[in-house]
């Protein structure tokens, strides 16, 4: 049987549960994933005076073909996007500014330094999201930025983040889709602090200054991102989950949950419903932590499936901004983007094909036997046949055939860098 015939057979199995497969695929087409540019160059960026990666994060591996120019990075993103079904977004960090060889300090970056990104996004029908880069810089060498006791250093990072919001607003206005400005700062201490409160007061004050200027949400939406620990901030991180959850709710900002920024057994999927009870919107960075925030490529594991289910079953497709955040330099970087993004979309399709209302009803009735049995049986339903049909209908490679294109691109382009 061909892809269409397999699809028709699979469709019947889902329809017996009352699942409208065609509606599910139409909904899937409308869900943008914000794809992080930094997988393509190992979080290096294009600053004239480049610094070693810092901020308690790490990239391991040395696979050949890494992008070293904006043009190479956009070409690589073009290739990955051609293998991923749907219309999506690209997430940029401030270090991806294009300054034509001029050394521009981070507190002096402007929209003009991202004109090429906006032009490219327009040509490709993409949205853009943005992040101030509060790491890999001499003024972040001691692990403190927005919570730094030195006002001069603190003010530098405040100016940088204010500039970043303006850049994001420019992107949102130009592209007709609001950009998400996500603030993550590595501030913390390696060993047990003698004062946990004062740095948090400073961070709160810095954020208040950053958000002083109101920006139309049609162009820019602000998010804040917590973290449990990083390399060099094992004992204490200023921007903890509780800090940012409180700040976001009090100040009407989005809380961004990164799946690698919690205890290894703490699941972000378990937080989504609670957050949505008290916040109109929520943002995610979907990653894969292996024993720590290792940022492995996202796979279709239980947690990813649960994240998709929580978004879909709670009617939150228009309330959750889904972004990815992983970087693996040990494998082909275009393959990493493709694997991770396709898996994120697969998790959403799996959720859309689940008879969620029926399963909810079983739970309300206390019928936990049927609930468990059906949830487990659905795992071996012909979901793959629906996925293949979706890929074919969206004119992207079916199954693992995309690997052939990646290998050809590696041979013709990446190997010559």
Swiss-Prot record:
The gene is rhaA. It catalyses: L-rhamnopyranose = L-rhamnulose. GO terms for molecular function: L-rhamnose isomerase activity; manganese ion binding. GO terms for biological process: L-lyxose metabolic process; rhamnose catabolic process. Keywords: Cytoplasm, Isomerase, Manganese, Metal-binding, Rhamnose metabolism. The keyword Signal does not apply. Pfam families: RhaA. Gene3D superfamilies: Divalent-metal-dependent TIM barrel enzymes (3.20.20.150). It is an enzyme of class 5 (isomerase). It is found in: Cytoplasm. Its main location: cytoplasm. Mn(2+) binds at residues 261, 293, 295. Belongs to the rhamnose isomerase family. This is L-rhamnose isomerase. Catalyzes the interconversion of L-rhamnose and L-rhamnulose. GO terms for cellular component: cytoplasm. It comes from Oceanobacillus iheyensis (strain DSM 14371 / CIP 107618 / JCM 11309 / KCTC 3954 / HTE831). Its EC number is 5.3.1.14. Its cofactor is Mn(2+). Binds 1 Mn(2+) ion per subunit. Pathway: Carbohydrate degradation; L-rhamnose degradation; glycerone phosphate from L-rhamnose: step 1/3.
């Amino acid at each position: 049987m061909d892809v269409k015939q397999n699809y028709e057979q699979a469709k019947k199995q889902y329809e017996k549960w009352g699942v409208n497969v065609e509606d599910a695929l139409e909904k899937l087409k409308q869900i943008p994933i914000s794809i992080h540019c930094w997988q393509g160059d190992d979080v290096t960026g294009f600053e004239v005076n480049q610094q070693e990666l810092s901020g308690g994060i790490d990239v391991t591996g040395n696979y050949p073909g890494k992008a070293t120019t904006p043009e190479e990075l956009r070409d690589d993103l073009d290739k990955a996007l051609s293998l991923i079904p749907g219309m999506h977004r690209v997430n940029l960090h401030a270090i991806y500014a294009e300054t034509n060889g001029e050394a521009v300090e981070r507190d002096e970056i402007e929209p003009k330094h991202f004109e090429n990104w906006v032009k490219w996004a327009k040509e490709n029908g993409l949205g853009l999201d943005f992040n101030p880069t509060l790491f890999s810089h001499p003024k972040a060498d001691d692990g403190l930025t927005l919570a730094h006791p030195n006002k001069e250093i603190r003010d530098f990072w405040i100016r940088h983040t204010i500039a970043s919001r303006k850049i994001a607003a420019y992107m949102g206005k130009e592209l007709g889709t609001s950009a998400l400005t996500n603030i993550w700062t590595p501030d913390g201490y390696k060993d047990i602090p003698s004062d946990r409160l004062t740095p948090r007061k400073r961070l709160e004050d810095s954020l208040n200054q950053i958000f002083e200027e109101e920006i139309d949400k049609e162009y820019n939406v602000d998010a804040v991102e917590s973290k449990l620990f990083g390399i060099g901030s094992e004992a204490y991180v200023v921007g903890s989950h509780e800090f940012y959850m409180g700040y976001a709710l009090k100040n009407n900002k989005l809380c961004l949950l990164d799946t690698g920024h919690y205890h290894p057994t703490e699941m972000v999927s378990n937080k989504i419903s609670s957050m949505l009870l008290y916040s109109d919107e929520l943002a995610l960075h979907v990653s894969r932590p292996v024993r720590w925030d290792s940022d492995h490529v996202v796979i279709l594991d239980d947690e990813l499936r649960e994240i998709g289910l929580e978004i879909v079953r709670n009617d939150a497709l228009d309330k959750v901004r889904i972004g990815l955040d992983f970087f693996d330099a040990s494998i082909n970087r275009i393959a990493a983007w493709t694997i991770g993004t396709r898996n994120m979309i697969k998790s959403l399709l799996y959720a859309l094909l689940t008879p969620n209302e029926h399963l909810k009803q079983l739970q309300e009735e206390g019928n936990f036997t049927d609930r468990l049995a059906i949830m487990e049986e659905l795992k071996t339903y012909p979901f793959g046949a629906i996925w293949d049909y979706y890929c074919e209908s969206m004119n992207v490679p079916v199954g693992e055939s995309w690997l052939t294109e990646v290998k050809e691109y590696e041979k013709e382009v990446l190997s010559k860098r």
